[in-house]
Regions:
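P-loop NTP-binding/switch modules centered on Walker-like glycine-rich loops
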Residues: 58, 179, 183, 187, ...
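A short, proline-enriched helix->beta-strand linker immediately N-terminal to the Walker B motif
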Residues: 172-176
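Short catalytic/signature loops enriched in Gly
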Residues: 4-5, 144-148, 240-345
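Conserved ABC transporter NBD signature motif
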Residues: 66-77
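Conserved ABC ATPase "signature" region
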Residues: 77, 129-148, 257
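The feature captures the beta-strand-to-loop junction immediately N-terminal to the Walker
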Residues: 42-44
Length: 351
């Protein structure tokens, strides 16, 4: 790509100190985010998705530390930021929607005041002007009767409405980048679709770039322009949404795609990924996914694969792409995935 990224993470490493031991949660992750795009970071729980992206807003837990790499934003390395530096970035330029809206909201404070605080802090509005902006934001995220709702508390809102409030707080300052950490968890399918459409509408109106953190490839298909797949603290494959769904190469990506709901034979066992992710307290030798991969190559257990370029926009960290490797066939269930998704009405990506 000729265009310049607005965030460029290079070889980022993050280590946590736990009970006197070191846990390497992120292992040399590199990722670019471009202006106006929607990037999905997908993987199992514990893969490092949230930890990695929290570095973009300076919100690592106190026992976590960036121990390698760089994250460039506006020509500055965010790994070197002080808390004073973050005050001009967090919320104002890069905002984050957390997974659980109930824990993101103060139960003792009225909803309107919580949105108003964000506006006062980052936009410099005060009094009636800030209140008016907060009410307008409630209306913008689809909350009916915003003047009345402004005076209510979080417990008076449904889960879907609370998520709209959290999105309103994040978007109130018109950030350049919005990070959404599992924004539709625990919401029913209808509300999930409404929340995704809301974020899409706000992105278009405000010109934001959006990062989705999710384990749900169904969400990815609906929202993403590009996808990065994470496993055991590493990005193992990245590409456009079409490349990841229809031309994936990493065996972990294959396993995730196999777990997509499909029209199958009645009584057929649902696919699962055998085994468990590696213990990140221990040094990982070779390909981290090899012990769970039924078709692992001998080299997978002894040497970590590099990234092999599939196209200008697509690369995968797997020995399967080495010219010397035996030819590997994709699992039968994800062959002709374009046709199968079309039959289920899910072939139209990102909209």
């Amino acid at each position: 790509m000729d265009r310049q990224p607005i965030i460029s993470a290079k070889d980022v490493e993050i280590t946590f100190s736990l009970r006197g031991k070191k846990l390497k949660a992120i292992r040399k992750c590199s990722l670019d985010l471009y202006d106006g795009e929607t990037l999905a970071i997908v993987g199992e729980s514990g893969s490092g998705k949230s930890v990695f992206t929290k570095t973009f807003v300076g919100m690592l837990d106190v026992n976590g530390k960036i121990t390698g790499g760089s994250i460039l934003y506006e020509g500055r390395d965010m790994t070197k930021f002080t808390e004073k530096d973050w005050l001009g970035i967090r919320g104002k330029k890069i905002a984050m929607v957390m997974q659980d809206p109930m824990t993101s909201l103060n139960p003792l404070k009225k909803i309107g005041k919580q949105i108003q605080e964000s506006i006062e802090h980052h936009q410099g509005l005060h009094g009636e002007a800030a209140k008016k902006a907060a009410i307008e934001m409630l209306a913008k995220v689809g909350i009916p009767d915003p003047e009345r709702r402004y005076e209510q508390y979080p417990h008076e809102f449904s889960g879907g409405m609370r998520q709209r409030v959290v999105i309103a707080i994040a978007a109130a300052c018109r950030p350049q980048i919005l990070i959404c950490d599992e924004p539709t968890t625990a919401l029913d399918v209808t509300i999930q679709a409404q929340i995704l459409q809301l974020i899409r509408d706000l992105q278009k109106e405000l010109g934001m770039s959006v990062i989705y953190i999710t384990h749900d490839l169904g969400v990815v298909a609906n929202v993403a322009d590009r996808v990065a797949v994470m496993y055991a603290g590493q990005i193992v494959e990245y590409g456009t949404v079409e490349e990841i769904f229809y031309d994936a190469w990493h065996p972990y990506t294959w396993a995730l795609l196999q777990a997509l709901p499909q029209l199958g034979t009645k009584g057929e066992a649902l696919p699962t990924i055998d085994g468990t992710p590696p213990n990140l307290f221990n040094e990982i030798k070779g390909d981290a996914f090899a012990p769970r991969n039924k078709h692992a190559l001998a080299i997978d257990f002894v040497a970590e694969p590099p990234f092999f370029q599939v196209s200008e926009t697509h690369a995968a960290k797997t020995w399967y792409l080495d010219p010397r490797a035996p030819k590997m066939e994709r699992p039968h269930s994800i062959q002709n995935l374009r046709e199968k998704m079309g039959k289920m009405g899910g072939s139209n990506f990102n909209g």
